[in-house]
Swiss-Prot record:
The alpha and beta chains are autoproteolytically processed from a single precursor protein within the mitochondrion. It comes from Scheffersomyces stipitis (strain ATCC 58785 / CBS 6054 / NBRC 10063 / NRRL Y-11545). Its main location: mitochondrion. This protein may be expected to contain an N-terminal transit peptide but none has been predicted. Keywords: Acyltransferase, Amino-acid biosynthesis, Arginine biosynthesis, Autocatalytic cleavage, Mitochondrion, Multifunctional enzyme, Transferase. Belongs to the ArgJ family. The record marks T137, G138 as: Involved in the stabilization of negative charge on the oxyanion by the formation of the oxyanion hole. Catalyzes two activities which are involved in the cyclic version of arginine biosynthesis: the synthesis of acetylglutamate from glutamate and acetyl-CoA, and of ornithine by transacetylation between acetylornithine and glutamate. It catalyses: N(2)-acetyl-L-ornithine + L-glutamate = N-acetyl-L-glutamate + L-ornithine; L-glutamate + acetyl-CoA = N-acetyl-L-glutamate + CoA + H(+). The record marks A213, T214 as: Cleavage. One of its GO terms (biological process) is L-arginine biosynthetic process. GO terms for molecular function: glutamate N-acetyltransferase activity; L-glutamate N-acetyltransferase activity. This is Arginine biosynthesis bifunctional protein ArgJ, mitochondrial. Substrate binds at T177, K203, T214, E303, N436, S441.
Length: 441
């Protein structure tokens, strides 16, 4: 069980997961600089709470974003979604992010504060007006200490930006709240004789059940991708990554994922038309895999979590059905507590499959459904149910599998449709209750 120290919404990274999942180095896209500082939102007086990304390349970047479906959308969500729609994804060249305060359900003052964060950032960076998107995360219902933020933006923008690994890690740390480690991923891929780089960061440990939860993130690339293509790629990749994870079943007021492409690495422009279809497919595959890697880190850092669980549903009639079934299991509190207790109570899995809201009566046929625990160490799977018939389960073997930190659960619906989906979740523990019971104390 990990130890977490919380002062309102700041943390000390004391989990062993920090040493395992925080990269010691990375590769980063050309033409971007990032950084983070403490500006005075978090009350401990030192935790980083303001982050900034800037496009340094001489041309306007392409941008796309997806936002929370929660009806109580936070002020930064409302302002940023309106802005990116008005600009049609062209000329978004920076992102300003604060942590420690969500600026959600804060009325007209909250809207003004979000707009002022954009205004000051654009002014300091000498951007054209409305070239910045804003994100916030933290406690809901409190007004921002806006004077601290507005005075911190020049300090951050003029003195604390850079493109080193340390700058990227500082930026990732500055957006954390109850996270026990900053989430940062980078990679390179080849296309059309050019080497392109992806870098991304995310925050989130609780209130995670997206259709888009308190989940913030952005990833950037130096590949030349049009706004239209980037928007299509982002929606596809988020559906299979950030919208396929769950920690606690809550969807927050602030969820935002932003993608920016500045084209600094050169090469032919990638659009979503027939002439660049092959290149589009490559970029979509790379970004989707990248987004999945980043999203999985959020689950691994689930508040109080001790297990990382991949629920793989196969042979469904459709991808939608497969995902609905996987999501139903992933969000079952009874299933998640059984995983924490290392209890092979597969009846809870079947129960969640059975009440999932799939599209037709033929989507789930009990006599065709099979369930297995699959160890991630390569050893033999443990079959629990085959075509609706229960197996005699070796409880010692089941307990041994469930002691592992990582676990795959395979659900074969046996419909003949051949469609599959993955959904990533974690267990539900005593510590989750402790963290969230003390969140504002």
């Amino acid at each position: 069980m990990r130890s977490v120290s919380i002062t309102r919404t700041s943390v000390r990274f004391v989990s062993d997961k920090a040493s395992r999942f925080v990269p010691k180095s990375g590769v980063y896209p050309q033409g971007f600089s990032v950084g983070g500082i403490h500006c005075g939102i978090k009350k401990d007086g030192k935790s980083l709470d303001l982050a900034l990304l800037r496009n340094d390349f001489g041309k306007d970047a392409s941008a796309a974003a997806v936002f929370t479906t929660n009806k109580f959308k936070a002020a930064p969500v409302q302002v940023s979604s309106k802005l990116i729609k008005e600009k049609k994804g062209v000329g978004i060249n920076s992102i300003i992010i604060n942590s420690g305060n969500a600026n959600a359900v804060t009325g007209a003052q909250g809207m003004k504060d979000a707009e002022d964060m954009i205004l000051v950032t654009d002014s300091v960076l000498e951007n054209p007006v409305n070239s910045t998107l804003v994100m916030s995360t933290g406690v809901i219902g409190n007004n921002l200490p806006i004077d601290n933020i507005l005075s911190g933006i020049p300090k951050l923008a003029l003195n604390n930006l850079g493109s080193t690994h340390e700058h990227w890690l500082t930026c990732a740390t500055a957006i954390c709240t109850t996270d026990t480690f900053p989430k940062l991923v980078s990679k390179q891929f080849e296309l059309n004789g050019h080497t392109y780089t992806l870098a991304g960061l995310a925050k989130g440990a609780g209130m995670i059940c997206p259709n888009m939860a308190t989940l913030l993130g952005f990833f950037v690339t130096d590949a030349p991708v049009t706004p239209s293509a980037l928007g299509q790629i982002l929606k596809y990749s988020v559906e299979r990554s950030f919208n396929s994870i769950s920690v606690d079943g809550d969807t927050s007021t602030n969820d935002t994922i932003i993608a920016i492409a500045n084209g600094a690495a050169g090469g032919p422009v990638i659009d979503n038309n027939s002439s660049t279809a092959e290149s589009f497919a490559v970029v979509q595959k790379e970004i989707t895999g990248f987004a999945q890697q980043l999203a999985q880190l959020v689950v691994r850092d689930g508040e109080g979590a001790t297990k990382f669980i991949n629920i793989h549903v196969k042979d469904a009639l459709s991808y939608k059905d497969a995902k609905i079934v996987a999501s139903s299991v992933a969000n079952s509190s009874l299933f998640k507590t059984a995983m924490f207790g290392q209890d092979a109570n597969w009846g809870r899995i079947l129960c969640a499959i059975g009440y999932s809201k799939v599209s037709t009566a033929d989507s789930i046929v009990p006599t065709k459904t099979s369930v297995s625990f699959v160890p991630t160490d390569g050893s033999e799977e443990l079959k629990l149910l085959i075509n609706g018939e229960p197996e005699v389960v070796d409880e010692e073997r089941a307990s041994e599998i469930l002691k592992s930190e990582d676990l795959d659960i395979v659900i074969d619906l046996g419909t003949g449709g051949g469609q599959s989906a993955n959904f990533w979740t974690c267990d539900l523990t005593h510590e989750y209750v402790t963290i969230n019971g003390d969140y504002r104390s």
